[in-house]
Amino acid sequence: MFVTPAFAQASGSVVGPDMLMSILPFILIFVIMYFLIIRPQRTQMKKRQEMLNSVRRGDTVVTGGGIVGKVLKVVDDNELELEIADGVRIRVVRATLMDVRVKGEPVADNKNK
């Protein structure tokens, strides 16, 4: 008996400022997330990529596994040859480098001799 009048009432449509006010918190959360998380992560990734691209012969580097070595030669765009002890050479993938500890002096090529 009492249910019939409730169904007979017209529902209010959500148009106008009420709709904007319901979406505004989600927009604000996304903007805050962009400036606190996404943007700093992009700059950090850009710095890391620049560091990886600037590795050259003579640099002392640390790999992801904690191996410290000196770059003997750049094999190609993705691989480096490191000397981790006297006479011990290993090849590593450039992306596994975590840090460049000491930037070495630029080594002159032997082509001029």
From Swiss-Prot:
The keyword Transport applies. The keyword Transmembrane applies. InterPro entries: Preprotein_translocase_YajC (IPR003849). One of its GO terms (cellular component) is plasma membrane. Keywords: Cell inner membrane, Cell membrane, Membrane, Protein transport, Translocation, Transmembrane, Transmembrane helix, Transport. The chain crosses the membrane at residues 18-38. GO terms for biological process: protein transport. It is a single-pass membrane protein. SMART domains: YajC (SM01323). Belongs to the YajC family. Part of the SecDF-YidC-YajC translocase complex. The SecDF-YidC-YajC translocase forms a supercomplex with SecYEG, called the holo-translocon (HTL). The SecYEG-SecDF-YajC-YidC holo-translocon (HTL) protein secretase/insertase is a supercomplex required for protein secretion, insertion of proteins into membranes, and assembly of membrane protein complexes. While the SecYEG complex is essential for assembly of a number of proteins and complexes, the SecDF-YajC-YidC subcomplex facilitates these functions. This is Sec translocon accessory complex subunit YajC. The lineage of its organism: Bacteria, Pseudomonadati, Pseudomonadota, Alphaproteobacteria, Hyphomicrobiales. The gene is yajC.
